[in-house]
Amino acid sequence: MAKTRTSSLRNRRQLKPAVAATADDDKDGVFMVLLSCFKIFVCFAIVLITAVAWGLIMVLLLPWPYMRIRLGNLYGHIIGGLVIWIYGIPIKIQGSEHTKKRAIYISNHASPIDAFFVMWLAPIGTVGVAKKEVIWYPLLGQLYTLAHHIRIDRSNPAAAIQSMKEAVRVITEKNLSLIMFPEGTRSRDGRLLPFKKGFVHLALQSHLPIVPMILTGTHLAWRKGTFRVRPVPITVKYLPPINTDDWTVDKIDDYVKMIHDVYVRNLPASQKPLGSTNRSN
């Protein structure tokens, strides 16, 4: 009985940051909400205009897919950085020295704004890996496809495996990196979700190291289902590359758990999965 009460109290403590964030939104007032909506409108207009222009360039470059990848990265650097600047979000980046070499970059996914961080911070020569439905995301989904990034059909295992094999072939031949969200979807409350196995399969086939990107605070800056962007301090932390040269197929589940545990240790309590705050930070 005592153990049950302790667990209940721990879960309540973990929910406090989310409750506090909701209370803060209520206190923001009409002006701040309208200002946030205005910023979102401005960013949407910028993305709309530039996406159309950049999309035309991509169409002209259809015969040169790898040039499209690099130009797509350049577009992401410019637009991603501009959007974050307009929102006025204070950012701290740690460990950027770990982005100098080819790798599989992975990031937790807790907010709509994460996509702009990934666009902004992905090194030139990085291929994105996402679910096939990304093509239906307005503007960015179409640019993603035109930029020759990879879409995975998760409902069809055979097709997904073939897509990953093609991804490995491309990045090996052209000396490219990969970037993806291993959770496979966006968290509703900012807490880390279980990881899919795709990034481990890619590591096994490519032998590229894995570089974890730890995004902290994005779930408070822009929460799923809202139009309120708040200037909450955000930290982007790159961890040292994790070598995969000696990884073997029979330990896939172990590798997924190991990398997931790396995130649990490095995320704040408000972003850890429920019941995991007893692990070291």
From Swiss-Prot:
Give an example GO cellular component term for this record: endoplasmic reticulum
Group of enzyme by EC:
transferase
Question: Keywords, A to Z?
Answer: Acyltransferase, Lipid biosynthesis, Lipid metabolism, Membrane, Phospholipid biosynthesis, Phospholipid metabolism, Transferase, Transmembrane, Transmembrane helix
A single Gene Ontology biological process assigned to it is: phosphatidic acid biosynthetic process
Entry annotated with the keyword Zinc: no
Q: Which InterPro entries has this protein been placed in? A: AGP_acyltrans, Plipid/glycerol_acylTrfase
Q: In which pathway does it act?
A: Phospholipid metabolism; CDP-diacylglycerol biosynthesis; CDP-diacylglycerol from sn-glycerol 3-phosphate: step 2/3
The reaction(s) annotated as catalysed by this protein in its Swiss-Prot or TrEMBL entry are: a 1-acyl-sn-glycero-3-phosphate + an acyl-CoA = a 1,2-diacyl-sn-glycero-3-phosphate + CoA
Q: Which Pfam families match?
A: Acyltransferase
Task: Answer whether the UniProt record assigns the keyword Nucleotidyltransferase to this protein.
Answer: no
Major localization class? membrane
For the motif HXXXXD motif, give the residue ranges: 109-114
Q: Which domain of life is it from?
A: Eukaryota
- Please list every transmembrane segment annotated in the UniProt record, as residue ranges: 40-60, 71-91, 110-130
Can you say where in the cell this protein is located?
Answer: Membrane
Gene Ontology molecular functions? 1-acylglycerol-3-phosphate O-acyltransferase activity
- EC numbers listed for it are 2.3.1.51
Q: What kind of membrane protein is this, topologically?
A: Multi-pass membrane protein
Biological role? Converts lysophosphatidic acid (LPA) into phosphatidic acid by incorporating acyl moiety at the 2 position. This enzyme uses erucoyl-CoA as an acyl donor.
Family the UniProt entry places it in: Belongs to the 1-acyl-sn-glycerol-3-phosphate acyltransferase family.
Q: Domain description from the entry?
A: The HXXXXD motif is essential for acyltransferase activity and may constitute the binding site for the phosphate moiety of the glycerol-3-phosphate.
NCBIfam families listed in its UniProt record:
AGP_acyltrn (TIGR00530)
According to UniProt, the name of this protein is 1-acyl-sn-glycerol-3-phosphate acyltransferase
Give the source species: Limnanthes douglasii (Douglas' meadowfoam)
